[in-house]
A protein has these predicted regions:
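Hydrophobic alpha-helical transmembrane segments of multi-pass inner-membrane transport and secretion
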Residues: 15-42, 265-300, 327-328, 332, ...
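Generic structural signal for small/hydrophobic residues in well-ordered secondary structure
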Residues: 13, 23, 44, 60, ...
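Membrane-proximal extracellular/periplasmic loop immediately following the first transmembrane helix
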Residues: 37-102, 203, 207-215, 224-228, ...
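Mid-to-C-terminal secondary-structure elements
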Residues: 120-133, 145-264, 461-639
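Intracellular coupling helices
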Residues: 6-14, 18, 22, 26, ...
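Small-residue-rich transmembrane alpha-helices
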Residues: 32, 36, 246, 323-389, ...
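C-terminal transmembrane helical bundles of large multi-pass transporters
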Residues: 625-706, 710, 721
Length: 773
């Protein structure tokens, strides 16, 4: 019997091959996107959750408004001792220095790339590092290291690494291996291959180069600890300084405070998972609409099967077999798609796991989706078949596809499709606006910088000899990426209420006319600083004017540590950070001519690669092992929008699939409708209706559905996008033409999808049609 059901199901899929193909492709893409995105979400949410007491482990960071969301992972090496002495809630605290970049090591002239972490003795006990071989106490000295068992196998094979030497290529230091330790049991922000002893060459509260981790006692009030660490005093060199420490749970650190190397933020992954789920729903609705329509077309056949002894369960199994077969085919194609895109997905998601890890989870998710789909479809098909099976068994169906399920399905698919297209276009418009706007305060196109070089290289002379370099600027830190941070607190300024305890934190920046001309900095009020002004004249940005509450800022006085400064001008806000973060108030001074900072230069269009290679070649002439950090400001700024750009690309693909499902669904349903309404069309032609009237009859029905779906999709899309745009400082307007273009475009696509089928039906000879009926 099952074999018979499969034959019938397969023949129906072949008979309606266009509709079946659209459903299979749509569901395959939906299954793939949904399964991978759910896997991705689960992976992101399980970072650093495998330690003992993982829910009680926190990272103590610092606040930098020019860095990401203002939370940095770094802190002073003094902080660990302060926490241990002054915070009774803390059970254990440790210091580490994590090298976020992979480094090279040598073993007998063979190079290996590894991840390194410097740790103190508390780290070993706090994270229960297990020693598999060697020194069980693991008190690392200056020239000693420990490696993981995986690294030991990679470098030494089956030989024991204890007592062997490795050379750190960066510093050319030789280290002796004293222990082999167990790797992390799960994925971590601080994954490592080598453990080195922690050492801070310049410990002070202002030097924030390490990461401080601590574990609190169970049932402690973490909010009270956060409040206490938000503002406290520290002492150094006989002086007291205000300090502030931010803390965040280690298990959610990657999602709550993502670093710049995270490709896609967790909230964007969740959004994509929801959208993928909607694509699956669209595909299933599209197929179920056609399946239920065909059930009602086959009601005489089903009634005859019932009369001849078929049970209700047997009929339900017959009808569900086609759906299950379609879902299995979709799943198979989905698995093929996963195999094709897996390398790209692994790179994008930064999931460094074996192939089996992906397929096991994906298979579970797909089976779950199939089970839920079949369960829902069983209830729906049983309900529809009960209403149609025994009613009017001897009458031929005059179904005109005007049932509630049909209209609801088309409305839902059009609603989702229009909303997808609208949201995707707004996102792409916003992304294009942010990447090309002049509202960021500085010109970054074709601007490069030598951020750091370990050797004394005459870059000025080198750049002057390059015809592709149009101009250069020295003595300033590169604004993007921001490599130099300095802030100070202002407690007194002109216009402040005498009884107020308000203060304002300002960024300490430098500027002059040369800098303003180079970057195109716009002066809004007053004038730019001049060398003749002296050291008491400053300019401030728009954010500082707002913070001080001034309406006429030029000429106002600011007191900094007992010294008075006069505001000479106001410049446009300069965005050093991602556009989702507000610009901090800043005060700009003349440069002190100490020669600090790198060198910034402009290149001709399309010559960045040539210029950068020439600079690297010149540095290699001085020292082949020299460290050089070159920066292209436009490329760096584009990385700030990496997550949004990736989301837009994913949404574009999903939106296309969703629209294709809706359009081909309409095409398929029109095909079935024309087949059902052949007699009606023939009678209308006999009564004088031309092809235009018949075409208008169909198009008007779908146009009304388009109007209704647009009526709900556009307002919802506007509310969602308005809320999303509020995350950005600079926002693109949502203009009226977006609505018009989407509505007209969808109407045109619907018209094209129905015209051919209706035209073909209208061209048939009425006499032949009526004879066949």
């Amino acid at each position: 019997m099952i074999k018979h059901y499969l034959k019938v199901a397969f023949r129906n899929l072949i008979k309606y091959k266009t509709q079946s193909l659209v459903s299979i492709i749509g569901l395959a893409v939906g299954f793939t996107c949904f399964a991978l995105s759910v896997l991705w979400i689960r992976y992101e949410m399980t970072y650093d959750n495998f330690y003992e007491g993982a829910d009680r482990i926190y990272l103590a960071g610092s606040s930098f408004r020019l860095y990401g969301d203002g939370f940095t992972y770094n802190s002073s090496s003094f902080l660990a001792d302060y926490l241990a002495k002054n915070c009774p809630e803390i059970e254990k605290v440790c210091r580490i220095f994590y090298d976020w970049n992979e480094k090279k090591i040598k073993n007998e002239d063979v190079e290996f790339v590894v991840r390194r972490i410097e740790v103190d003795s508390n780290f070993i006990s706090m994270f229960n590092i297990k020693v598999l071989d060697g020194d069980n106490h693991l008190q690392l000295k200056k020239d000693e290291i420990a490696i993981t068992e995986n690294t030991a196998k990679r470098i030494f094979g089956k030989e024991s690494p204890i007592g062997k030497h490795l050379i750190l290529e960066e510093s050319n230091e030789e280290k002796i291996i004293v222990a082999v330790v167990k790797s992390w049991e799960g994925h971590s922000l601080f994954s490592f291959d080598i453990l080195l002893p922690f050492h801070d060459t310049n410990p002070n509260w202002g030097n924030q180069r390490c990461q401080t981790l601590f574990r609190i006692y169970p049932n402690c009030d973490i909010e009270a600890l956060k409040q206490r660490l938000s503002e406290y005093e520290v002492q150094q060199d006989g002086h007291k300084y205000p300090n502030s420490t931010l803390i965040a749970p280690l298990s959610t650190l990657r999602s709550s405070h993502p670093r710049e190397d995270v490709n896609v933020k967790l909230n964007h992954i969740r959004l994509f998972a929801c959208i993928s789920g909607l694509v699956i729903i669209c595909g299933i609705c599209n197929y179920l609409t056609m399946l239920i329509t065909r059930i009602r077309m086959r009601k005489r056949e089903l009634a005859l099967r019932k009369v001849n002894g078929s049970s209700n369960g047997g009929l339900l199994t017959l009808l569900l077999t086609e759906l299950v077969l379609l879902l299995i085919l979709s799943s198979g194609i989905g698995l093929v798609l996963i195999e094709l895109i897996l390398p790209t997905f692994k790179r994008l998601s930064q999931i460094n796991e074996g192939v089996s890890f992906f397929y096991i989870e994906v298979f579970v998710y797909i089976l779950s989706l199939i089970a839920v789909t079949v369960g829902f479809a069983s209830l729906l098909i049983r309900y529809i078949s009960k209403r149609t099976l025994l009613s009017n068994i001897n009458k031929k169906s005059n179904l005109h596809l005007s049932g509630w399920f049909y209209k609801s399905s088309i409305l839902f698919q059009l609603f989702i499709g229009i909303a997808f297209v609208f949201c995707t276009l707004v996102m792409m418009k916003q992304l294009n606006f942010l990447l090309n706007t002049k509202e960021l305060g500085i010109e970054r196109h074709n601007v490069g910088a030598v951020v750091y070089c370990s050797e004394n290289v005459p870059f000025k002379e080198i750049l002057e000899q390059m015809p592709d370099v149009t101009k250069y600027l020295s003595g300033f830190q590169t604004p993007i990426p921001k490599m130099y941070f300095s802030t100070f607190r202002i407690k007194e300024w002109e216009g402040k209420a005498t009884d107020s305890e308000q203060y304002i934190d300002l960024e300490d920046e430098t500027i002059n006319q040369e800098y303003a001309d180079f970057f195109g900095v716009e002066v809004l009020e007053g004038s730019m600083l001049d060398e003749k002004d002296g050291k008491n004249m400053v300019v401030i940005n728009e954010a500082a004017v707002k913070a001080f509450g001034w309406t006429q800022p030029v000429g106002k006085k600011i007191d900094k540590l007992g010294r008075h400064y006069i505001v000479k001008g106001v410049i446009k806000n300069i965005s050093y950070n991602a556009p989702i973060h507000p610009v901090a108030p800043a005060m700009f001074f003349l440069p002190d001519n100490t020669g600090r900072g790198g060198i910034i230069f402009k290149v001709k269009e399309g010559t960045w690669n040539v210029v950068s290679e020439k600079i690297k070649a010149e540095v290699n002439k001085v020292n082949p092992n020299a460290e050089l950090m070159l920066s292209n400001m436009e490329e760096v700024y584009d990385t700030y929008m990496k997550s949004e750009r990736t989301l837009c690309q994913l949404l574009s693909i999903v939106s296309f699939i969703c629209i294709a499902i809706a359009v081909f669904g309409i095409f398929s349903l029109v095909t079935l409708s024309c087949q059902q309404r052949r007699k009606e069309i023939a009678i209308r032609k006999v009564n004088g209706a031309n092809i235009g009237i018949i075409l208008n009859l169909f198009f008007r029905e779908y146009l009304l559905l388009l109007v209704f779906s647009s009526f709900f999709a556009f307002p919802l899309g506007y509310v969602m996008m308005k809320h999303w745009l509020e995350n950005y400082i600079k926002q693109t307007p949502i203009e009226w033409w977006l609505y018009a273009v989407i509505f007209i475009g969808m109407g045109f696509v619907i018209f094209l999808s129905i015209i051919w089928r209706v035209w073909k039906a209208a061209q048939q000879n009425p006499a032949e049609v009526l004879k066949g009926e």
